[in-house]
């Protein structure tokens, strides 16, 4: 099983008569805050696979191949991580990075603080959707098909933004925890059923 496939999760919405949607975490953006400042010149000389061009960008760019994740490292001790596909993978990357620092004698003090900034996910409800009907029933939604083919739905709880397409495909952004993604998909499936906006099962 490839790394891509392993991050697809089938969830049970509890909605009778509907297939189980597939949900995939596409990208997690997180900041990691260390308690001490970092010597970026030292890191550049000690760690492989880093790019540091302070004239172009104030941070150091560290690219990992497995998992395929990018880390921006700043002198202040702040790091920005993009590309993780799960919280567990994100934590693994942080541990891997701190171990690389320790192995090369780069000082790190205290325990890092990890803050999730955004989780982006895709989902397939495996149904066809009447977006006009959904737009009438969904509060805080926008559907202007002449400008964009999907319905934009701003959910209050969990606080996420969803792009919903007539094919049953969706994009979810703004989540801070993986469970918020799954809760949002379950909730929107129920709302679509209640709105009578599901017009067929996708094969």
From Swiss-Prot:
General factor that plays a role in the activation of archaeal genes transcribed by RNA polymerase. Binds specifically to the TATA box promoter element which lies close to the position of transcription initiation. Gene3D superfamilies: TATA-Binding Protein. GO terms for biological process: DNA-templated transcription initiation. Keywords: DNA-binding, Repeat, Transcription, Transcription regulation. It comes from Aeropyrum pernix (strain ATCC 700893 / DSM 11879 / JCM 9820 / NBRC 100138 / K1). Pfam families: TBP (PF00352). This is TATA-box-binding protein. One of its GO terms (molecular function) is DNA binding. Disulfide bonds: none annotated. Sequence repeats lie at residues 25-101, 116-192. The keyword Nucleotidyltransferase does not apply. NCBIfam families: PRK00394.1-1, PRK00394.1-2. Belongs to the TBP family. The gene is tbp. HAMAP family: TATA_bind_prot_arch (MF_00408).
